[in-house]
Amino acid sequence: MSWPQVQPEVNIGVVGHVDHGKTTLVQAITGVWTSKHSEELKRGMTIKLGYAEASIGVCPNCNKPEAYVTEYSCNQCGSDEKPQFLRKVSFIDAPGHEILMATMLSGAALMDGALLVVAANEPFPQPQTREHFVALGIVNIKNLIIVQNKVDVVSKEEALKQYKQIKEFLKGTWAEDAPIIPVSALHKINIDALIEGIQKYIPTPQRDLSKDPIMLVIRSFDVNKPGTPYNELKGGVIGGSIIQGKLEIGDEIKILPGLRHEKPGGKVEYEPLYTTITSIRFSDLEVKEAKPGGLVALGTELDPSYVKADSLVGSVVVKSSNKNVSVLWNLKIENYQLLERVVGAKELVKVENIKKGEVLMLTLGSATTLGVAKNIKNDELEVELKRPLVVWDKDLRVVISRQVSGRWRLVGWGIIKI
């Protein structure tokens, strides 16, 4: 016997400043080291979005929080009675380095809740702690847990002093009541209390499976090894998260904006890609249908050359019959709001007004594109995009970043008008 093989039902982001122990924390909970990319292993930092899953269970014989486990046995009491399965969750490990803010923002679009990891042995808040916190608020994350990591390398007094600083920082913000849970990810101390916190504070959202399915793409790849005979080639794979509705094997889908074509005279157009879903998997689990929660890999009939090296990242997948999705080269943003200060730099710089002709970076869902500010009046902003954005609903929030001292910095957000 073991726990049921099911897809994850909730996505939990793991965010915070570089080197504060995000990837180590994910490993402590799931047993998976999410940095797999060769460059990541060499540089010791997360570059792409990492991913891992964990099943959560509770031992009927132990007291809480020790009763919470992520394995099909309890090391605490050694009882023959197996822990009861509660749910499967997935973790999206976002990069903490300042140059990778766009990657963090594209991951935030998939999150149902988040763990903000703070190192107890560094001054609080660090620049990306602050920037990630603001970003989570902008993309409307409601469920947050602050994880005070590395408490094993500071005294009790230092840990308590920082706890008070965190409380002070949260006061008056969207996350004023967020719980703060101290852990040592390296020594796996208090991980059971964190799992209890995840169960209590990051519930699985209510999902409406009758809605038109929408999937945000964060990966795409060719699974064929070099030299595979032509008649054995497998179609391209797209990976991402379904944010509403459900997809099934055999569904005909379209991928937007699609393939880029350069026309004579330098004009660029995008053509939607149409294909059929041939397989669906979550990590090692093959399923017939996929719902929101977890990162799903869709096998398709696409030519593998279309998906190579994450070329479809930022795309949106819908059913081929869906006519309610717009692909926009010109974005009208209303009720846009700028932060008072640029939060991700060491010094807090005042945010200047957006100027006509300024190049901005916009993030919507898992897509990031550059654009030029054209018309600005009151709280409305029009931006001409270098690559079109796919708008799948009304009142979507777009995140606005601009170059500050050679780095893209989060400066505001607005609502897309369609």
Swiss-Prot record:
Region ranges (G1): 16-23
Region annotation G4: where it falls in the sequence: 149-152
Enzymatic class: hydrolase
CDD domains from the UniProt entry: eIF2_gamma (cd01888), eIF2_gamma_II (cd03688), eIF2_gamma_III (cd15490)
GO molecular function, one term: GTP binding
Region annotated G2, chain positions: 44-48
Transmembrane intervals: none
Record InterPro entries: eIF2G, eIF2g_C, eIF2g_dom_2, eIF2g_GTP-bd, P-loop_NTPase, Small_GTP-bd, T_Tr_GTP-bd_dom, TIF2_gsu
Binding locations of GTP: D19, H20, G21, K22, T23, T24, N149, K150, V151, D152, S184, A185, L186
Residue sites binding Mg(2+) 2 per the record: D19, G44
Function: eIF-2 functions in the early steps of protein synthesis by forming a ternary complex with GTP and initiator tRNA.
Family designation: Belongs to the TRAFAC class translation factor GTPase superfamily. Classic translation factor GTPase family. EIF2G subfamily.
Assembly information from the UniProt record: Heterotrimer composed of an alpha, a beta and a gamma chain.
Name of the protein described by the UniProt record: Translation initiation factor 2 subunit gamma
